[in-house]
Amino acid sequence: MRSGGDRCAANVPPVGARSWWLDEALKADPGEPCPPLAGETAADVCVVGGGFAGLWTAYELTERAPGIDVVLVEADICGAGGSGANGGFFSCSWHMVATLCHFFGEDEGVRYAKALADQVDELDAWVARHEADIEAHHEGILYAQAGEWQDPPDPEGQKILARHGYADRLRVVEAAGARRYAGSPRFVGGAFTPDLATVQPAKLVRELRRVLLGRGVRIYERTPLKELLPGRPATVVTPAGRVRADQVVYTVGAWAAGHPHWRRAFAVARDFMVVTEPIPERLREIGWLTHVGIADSREMLYYLRRTDDDRVAIGGGAMGAMYDGDLDGDGPIARFARTSPRLAEVPARGLVWLFPQLEGVRFEAAWSGPMDVDRAGVPFFFTAPSGNLHAGLGFSGHGLAATKAGGKTLASLALGADDEWAHLPVVGPPLTLVPPEPLRWPLLQAVSWLMETGDRREEEGRPRGLVRRAAQRVFDAYCAARPTSAHG
């Protein structure tokens, strides 16, 4: 007899080429067409990439310098990459403040965490100002401990927040407190922060696009970058045109792995999500009445949330590593990492494991989204020695609030502003580098598989044992390379 999780996984449809979020957003409002670039043009700033980082950068530029001439080029349509395919968690980083402090020092780590938390409040004001329909719910997130085997809230992070007057921003909860948000019998505790909003990510992309077009930003979709020629002005070369710009901002996310300069800066992986049919009655039965986001505390965590039409969207639990950053190839590794039925079934099984009450639920869509995975788990913002080429990369699947803050940083760098955003601790080269191929893919794939296997053993009541030690050894090998350059 198949388990409930296996029966649930059997209901998962094939992995789609576009996310359910983007399909729904385009149905609601296809928006004004943005044709490809044809011919030559000039601009004060050219933004390369139409995801959140590029769109927020263009927004900040036009906010601070009305009348500035901004061109944005996007290889597909705005939001076709990770920005339109994620969980829609516009979140702070209080839960990882100890990690931030490890890399940046305590004062700077807390300053960056506070900057991200502020973006959540600012999003509320942005939505009201622009009358943006992005299905935003600023209700917080529960970092659930779904079983005694999962890590409890980090006590070191709690101490750091208390020292800086932010103890109330991440509150430890017991089992009853965790289950108040949603009635999972797995929840034994966790931590809650109010500093998160769930959004429909593709609708946020489309609303940003709408606002920018209204401000006179020239957006060229289906216009991939072929070459970036340094100089003053710099030249962005596309298949049928060129943009000469005083400043260029490079925000192509995971696709930057194809550029020699960033090949060692991060690994590229795809995360999988599924979404259920509308199940309002079943959600009421388990007490899931709010739009609080939820993430558990396994090594390959699940993240999940309600939608406005009473579905559950869940992702995580596994990932598909891309060989040498090959996101668009047709080889077996690229196809598996992009469309694997097995990887799509992992979050589907996870939903029924977390909520056995939802056994038999039908899933309506499955998709995957690319991530530029920095080993430190934090982005970096870099200006080339020429002074007029800037990049924001490495968002590592935590990019919604980080790209809004990052847009401020990249705008400051492009405008030459000497302000707090130009001096965030994430401004500079990547903190860590990843191994070269052909080592990177097998090491990353092995780490992912071992962590997923260990989580599954714990779910079944078996200890990780040798799996934990093997995962640690492979991860240590992955982290061992410490070259002096991101090249090659």
Enumerate the predicted regions with their spans:
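Extreme N-terminal leader/targeting segments of oxidoreductases
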Residues: 1-45, 63-64, 68-69, 95, ...
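Glycine-rich Rossmann-fold phosphate-binding loop(s) that bind the pyrophosphate
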Residues: 49-55, 75
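Internal hydrophobic alpha-helix adjacent to the cofactor/substrate pocket in enzyme cavities
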Residues: 62, 402-424
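Glycine-rich FAD pyrophosphate-binding loop
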Residues: 62-85
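Glycine-rich active-site loop/strand segments that organize a redox cofactor
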Residues: 85-115
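Active-site substrate-recognition segment that forms the wall
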Residues: 88, 129-137, 225-227, 233, ...
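Rossmann-like flavin
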Residues: 103-211
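Helical element adjacent to the flavin cofactor pocket in flavoenzyme catalytic cores
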Residues: 159-160, 185-247, 251
